[in-house]
Design a protein with these regions (language model features):
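Bacterial N-terminal signal peptides
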Residues: 8-16
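Sequence/structural segment immediately N-terminal to covalent heme-attachment motifs in c-type
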Residues: 23-48, 53
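C-terminal capping alpha-helices of c-type cytochrome domains
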Residues: 82-126
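Sec/Tat signal peptide C-region and signal peptidase I cleavage site
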Residues: 17-22
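Positively charged n-region of N-terminal signal peptides that target proteins for export
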Residues: 1-4
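Structured segments of extracytoplasmic/periplasmic soluble domains
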Residues: 32-42, 56-59, 91-98, 121-125
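N-terminal, post-signal-peptide region of Sec/Tat-exported proteins
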Residues: 44-69
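Short Fe-S-cluster ligation motifs
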Residues: 65-82
Length: 126
């Protein structure tokens, strides 16, 4: 009986800790975003080589009206791809693996904490 109680307490503790880690740190994400600044901005209406990332979390793919997306990204948007945290994580880890023929030349973020942190940063720019 005691073992079950201890196990249940440990399982509950893990459930509360894991989501907190998955949320990421926006301040650390701002530093990670420095790798993105050559091509992206987080200000409304400011496109560079890549589209503005202001409001990207929750946005449909290829939805910035005044940006010329690749045909591959336009097709993903037409299929209904939405940039939720899961899709952003997968894309930012391996852009060309997730959207073959994307215009994004960046190879991807390799560290899971960098992915979580940059997404936390992007969430601060709705």
């Amino acid at each position: 009986m005691l073992r079950k109680s201890v196990f249940a307490a440990m399982a509950s503790a893990i459930l509360f800790v894991v989501p907190a880690q998955a949320e990421g740190d926006a301040a650390a994400g701002a530093k990670v975003f420095n790798q993105c600044k050559a091509c992206h901005e987080v200000e409304k209406g400011v496109n560079k080589v890549g589209p503005t990332l202001k409001g990207v979390v929750g946005r449909k793919a290829a939805a910035v009206a005044d940006y010329k997306y690749s045909e591959a990204m336009i097709a993903k948007g037409a299929e209904g791809l939405v940039w939720d945290e899961a899709n952003l994580t997968t894309y930012l880890a391996n852009p060309k693996g997730f959207v073959p023929k994307t215009k994004m030349a960046f190879a991807g973020l390799k560290k899971p904490e960098d992915l979580a942190n940059v997404i936390a940063f992007l969430k601060t720019h709705p």
